[in-house]
């Protein structure tokens, strides 16, 4: 059985990769994928602490985070489709060009 430190290190690495991806990429789809990776890293932390402490609350909270992530993905994809229809691009730098 692995120690909790191993799970936390893996979670920190995944979260760092996601953060770097959000800060360095311009493609909206890649940014959303990096945000999902960050949420999964947080979920891994919740599961690790839940198992370590013998409490099920962390595992229940993961289901709420997954539900919010699914809703975020649906709304984000709808926004990207609408943006692509208008600008024929999904680069986040082009978002500033949109007028209200």
From Swiss-Prot:
Gene Ontology CC: one annotated term: NADH dehydrogenase complex
Disulfide bonds: none
GO biological process assignments: ATP synthesis coupled electron transport
Sections of the chain in a coiled coil: none
Record's keyword annotation contains Translocase: yes
Pfam families referenced in this protein's UniProt entry, alphabetically: Oxidored_q2
Keywords: Cell inner membrane, Cell membrane, Membrane, NAD, Quinone, Translocase, Transmembrane, Transmembrane helix, Transport, Ubiquinone
Catalysed reaction equations from the record: a quinone + NADH + 5 H(+)(in) = a quinol + NAD(+) + 4 H(+)(out)
Enzyme class: translocase
EC identifiers of the protein: 7.1.1.-
Membrane topology: Multi-pass membrane protein
Chief location category: membrane
Subcellular location per the Swiss-Prot or TrEMBL entry: Cell inner membrane
Function: NDH-1 shuttles electrons from NADH, via FMN and iron-sulfur (Fe-S) centers, to quinones in the respiratory chain. The immediate electron acceptor for the enzyme in this species is believed to be ubiquinone. Couples the redox reaction to proton translocation (for every two electrons transferred, four hydrogen ions are translocated across the cytoplasmic membrane), and thus conserves the redox energy in a proton gradient.
Assembly information from the UniProt record: NDH-1 is composed of 14 different subunits. Subunits NuoA, H, J, K, L, M, N constitute the membrane sector of the complex.
Protein name: NADH-quinone oxidoreductase subunit K 2
Top-level taxonomy: Bacteria, Pseudomonadati, Thermodesulfobacteriota, Desulfuromonadia, Geobacterales
């Amino acid at each position: 059985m692995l120690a909790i430190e191993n799970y936390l290190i893996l979670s920190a690495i995944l979260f760092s990769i996601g953060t770097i991806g959000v800060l360095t990429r311009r493609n909206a789809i890649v940014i959303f994928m990096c945000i999902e990776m960050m949420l999964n890293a947080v979920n891994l932390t919740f599961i690790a602490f839940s198992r370590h402490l013998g409490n099920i609350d962390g595992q229940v909270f993961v289901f709420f985070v997954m539900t919010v992530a699914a809703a975020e993905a649906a709304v984000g994809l709808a926004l990207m489709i609408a943006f692509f229809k208008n600008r024929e691009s999904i680069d986040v730098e082009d978002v500033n060009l949109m007028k209200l």
